[in-house]
UniProtKB/Swiss-Prot annotation:
It holds the Pfam family FAD_binding_4. It comes from Penicillium roqueforti (strain FM164). This is FAD-dependent monooxygenase prx3. Residues 63-235 form the FAD-binding PCMH-type domain. The gene is prx3. Glycans are attached at residues 197, 281, 307, 329, 361, 477. Residues 1-19 form the signal peptide. FAD-dependent monooxygenase; part of the gene cluster that mediates the biosynthesis of PR-toxin, a bicyclic sesquiterpene belonging to the eremophilane class and acting as a mycotoxin. The first step of the pathway is catalyzed by the aristolochene synthase which performs the cyclization of trans,trans-farnesyl diphosphate (FPP) to the bicyclic sesquiterpene aristolochene. Following the formation of aristolochene, the non-oxygenated aristolochene is converted to the trioxygenated intermediate eremofortin B, via 7-epi-neopetasone. It is an enzyme of class 1 (oxidoreductase).
Amino acid sequence: MLSLKAFLALSLSIHLSQGLVASVSHRRANACTELSRSYPDSTIHPGSSVFAEDVIEPWSQTCQTTPTCVFAPASAEEVAGGLAILRKADQTFAVRTQGHMPIPGAADISNGVLMVTTSLNSVQYADDSKSVVQIGAGNRWLDVYKVLAKDNLAVVGGRFGQVGVSGLLLGGGISYFNSDHGWGANSVVNYEVVLANGTVCAANAQQNSDLYWALKGGSFNFGIVTRFDLATFSVPYMWGGSAFYDASALDPLVNAYASYAVASGGSSDPAAHSDPSILYNVTTGEVSGYGIYMHRGDDPAPAALKNFTDIPSTFQDFRVGKTILGLENDTTPVNFGVGNRRQLFSSTALASSAEAVYLVNQTFFDVIAANPQIKTTTDLSVTNTYQLFTPGMIRAAKASGGDPIGLYDPLGNGVLAVLYGGNWADAKDDEIIYKFFQDMIDELDNRAKKLGLYYDFVYLNDAAPTQTKDIFQKFSNGTALPKLREIAESYDPDQVFQTLTPGGFKLINSPA
């Protein structure tokens, strides 16, 4: 039996623990109240129509959550003020720009505060030269392209207009202009960042240059970026569009990409871009193809893409448009709007070669055949998309000053990133589908390793929930993680962006 002294000590310990928990709960409950008091026009509570618009309609239903309240700051200063309130309350929170990330918790939260940056939506030139455009973090790329099109200008931005600026750039950034300029992040000349201590600072080649480097792919680990300043360049015309194919065209489509994805192929033209996909409808068993093709300039028949445009298609729409804006509607996949679907990305990479292209295609169909249980799911569609990081892109990224991602070119053909995508209707199928996609990645990685084609990289913006811990240890062939951690410790010594923002891609979760 406990002595009276031990009993009293235990009782006091329990009482103090309960008091501490109650104190923390009280502080957290007060976070939304304090946000409302300090920023009444920027704080949204459950029950309002605006709350429903911002929260109840995520892009992917896998991210359906209910935050305690929504905070929509209208300036960097409001971001800093709101962050101070959240820190004082020890309140967990998430930051969402456009929410185009299907990983639960990456840009959503339950029982915490959701900070949305959609009010940070200015797009303006830095000066009269129009060589730099200043983009608020809450914009979609379509908003940016509408401004730039008036001056026949472009930036290394997203391929699809509905995608958010912030998420794309903080994860690297695939663009139609990568071959000449590197990642989208490599064209950022300055970041406006709110640090954990509330300081609003600039990060560029001259100021906070270590933070500037880290933000080029380091995700949401160092602060809240409120503005991106990007270099512009002239693009008066773009040729491009999309094409749909039936099953009879799949072999020609894969053959065309096998020829394209080598240094002697069409990808050697830095103006060209090709992203073909193979689609499999699990419910119907139908197999089809889809391709997005772009070429900078007004050539109505670019030779670099002839192997694709020669393939008979069920539908195609190729034309010359004014700037990238003139083709945006023709190249945005239909599932990029908000809907009632559940979405999943999963990614891996290979050293690009014709053999790698064929391996990806064969593995895709082999794993589908080996997993008949997916036929029990409701309305599942699966895609296999090829995305090439060309030798020119890798050189341009290094020439810009480099980045944490640190791509290298193993065979001289660039790096072939593979995106497996899925969308389906019912949450009851999540476990089967998540395992199926992991099996797909594991099988492709194993086969690639046996052939000497494996490239140890996962593109952050296309990662699966099971891959969030693996991202940073793969950067720069395994050498970037210690430096990223050192920079995070310097700018966020209290680990606010490691612990109070629990979701997404965290340095603290990456294996040493």
